[in-house]
Amino acid sequence: MKLLSLLMLAGIAQAIVPPREPRSPTGGGNKLLTYKECVPRATISPRSTSLAWINSEEDGRYISQSDDGALILQNIVTNTNKTLVAADKVPKGYYDYWFKPDLSAVLWATNYTKQYRHSYFANYFILDIKKGSLTPLAQDQAGDIQYAQWSPMNNSIAYVRXNDLYIWNNGKTKRITENGGPDIFNGVPDWVYEEEIFGDRFALWFSPDGEYLAYLRFNETGVPTYTIPYYKNKQKIAPAYPRELEIRYPKVSAKNPTVQFHLLNIASSQETTIPVTAFPENDLVIGEVAWLSSGHDSVAYRAFNRVQDREKIVSVKVESKESKVIRERDGTDGWIDNLLSMSYIGNVNGKEYYVDISDASGWAHIYLYPVDGGKEIALTKGEWEVVAILKVDTKKKLIYFTSTKYHSTTRHVYSVSYDTKVMTPLVNDKEAAYYTASFSAKGGYYILSYQGPNVPYQELYSTKDSKKPLKTITSNDALLEKLKEYKLPKVSFFEIKLPSGETLNVKQRLPPNFNPHKKYPVLFTPYGGPGAQEVSQAWNSLDFKSYITSDPELEYVTWTVDNRGTGYKGRKFRSAVAKRLGFLEAQDQVFAAKEVLKNRWADKDHIGIWGXSYGGFLTAKTLETDSGVFTFGISTAPVSDFRLYDSMYTERYMKTVELNADGYSETAVHKVDGFKNLKGHYLIQHGTGDDNVHFQNAAVLSNTLMNGGVTADKLTTQWFTDSDHGIRYDMDSTYQYKQLSKMVYDQKQRRPESPPMHQWSKRVLAALFGERAEE
């Protein structure tokens, strides 16, 4: 797979050139990727190893599982190992496990039942490794525990059941809260906080010394309820009356859940409500909680106003219960992302600091902030962005992180000293590549993961020497050999420049047997949401996009374009879409389509666009422009009107309806001419059990188009019974991708001009579809 292909863009594009390396998947064989190899998920894909590092006196230790299921304590450097849990002590059918910090016990989750994107219910058991005894966390548990977590320093477990918080300690359980129920959540988030704020299933945090627990309480009283019917409900025979799931789901401008901040003394079970005054109760979102001490002296929370364009970091002194705003920011030029990146680092030149990422300068960078408030210290700077903090080594005074310093599509690993501010690459940062790393508990070792664009691999390094690996962890040599049997799509990365001066990143896939003298259909595949990124130097998944590029009967060229509003190109580029989602993004997709048509090989009669979720919304908004460039489109699980989506996501970018009524009206898909004038077809796909983007969006969109005069030969709506946002219920994804494949095949076969019809056929079509049949 040459990573620079025949662009033939006549100077309109600037290539992003990765180096040629021996591990580049150049193919060289004659096999073409098949449908079954790519759909519904890629079967030819790289392997990777994820280690559960253990914090112990000896660095570089981790837990692995042997072939027979036993849990092994291994030292990655010395290759020594010790069996901690024999195979016959491992519960059958377990879902996950967590070791007690001193390795004397294991907490097991069994009887897994999925709830939302991250949350689930389960039974939990504690295995005493020395005694070999297995004890239920709760004697009467019935697969109903929502979350459980070991304390970092003692024998305690905090867990949540029926939305109430409990503390287990050496076999004894203390119920901490008594008010948990359908509308009150203690220590776990409700739906909207799980989905849009934390991206996780817990809302409790032990202090580093294990003596205190900070947790949040959410109150959904008054939050409107959305009802989702489940027609089959996983039954062989559908119930006469569908099961109805009622979710407190705050839509735009509706009442949000309120949130309270609490502290619990583990030893005394004394619980304290800390007043939150950063913003009024109905204008408050708590986005992050972090302990700002090595013991339990200070804890902080990140507070946003409702529309998340103002931020306050509030420190709470645990003993006095006093609160203080130690940092605040006005981000009304756009929005403020919740990066969940606060981390205590301790004393620096006589003052206590924590580290955080902020894009207040216009670019996301690492700063040191005084725990008690005061002027920040910038550790990184420049017109590039820090993506994530990987590890803080307080002994060496180093922060390890990934960034886009080379290019917005790349990731390289660096360290920066918060003593000297010297920044050091741990990889070759002069190549177009995509790296991340996983550091051992004490930071002495790390697994470097090269993730693309060539065949991924993983190597072990010592932080004392980033030049020479200690060993290879995952080679993917078998994948490299297998790829030699194939002719693969030709992938290239480049930029196109907008008339306004911004550049857009593009990922292009050309058919394996590409001939510049032939005509090819083109499919655009955007996501395009705020802060997202699709165009990156990460491994090119051999998925549906690669399939439609490879199949000789399809041979689509695909373009993935990251429009304005997407991530890692600075705050100005991101914030351009604020208060008008779908407007600039659609303009950029249209501009890119006009650019692709400057290539002689691009077939102007067969230019499609397909996206899922926000990409489905963007597909509809792009067709709505009536540009005449796109000839067909597919929206999978789309938002069609952001007034129908949840408040905490939408208002971050659009504000409330009261503040931006005209913006919401324009953002909704409401103009039908672009759909009526399509040369080809428009397909909508949606799961009826989608708890994220409700099926209501597809129903409203379909109705808007039908009532607006879009004829039946132009529009198909496909629902998937009981499927969620990922369309996975009852093999629905299999049907979904077959339908997608048929759609792109039919559109390629569609002729620009309809064949002559008998007068009788014309009369029938005129009666069915209106005047268009007479054209």
From Swiss-Prot:
Major localisation: secreted
Annotated EC: 3.4.14.5
Protein's name in the database: Dipeptidyl peptidase 4
pH dependence, entry free text: Optimum pH is 7.0-9.0.
GO MF term set: aminopeptidase activity; dipeptidyl-peptidase activity; serine-type endopeptidase activity
Provenance organism: Trichophyton rubrum
Enzyme class of the recorded protein, top EC level: hydrolase
Subcellular location: Secreted
Gene: DPP4
Active site: 613, 690, 725
GO process terms (BP): proteolysis
Function (record text): Extracellular dipeptidyl-peptidase which removes N-terminal dipeptides sequentially from polypeptides having unsubstituted N-termini provided that the penultimate residue is proline. Contributes to pathogenicity.
GO CC annotation terms, alphabetical: extracellular region; plasma membrane
NAD in keyword set: no
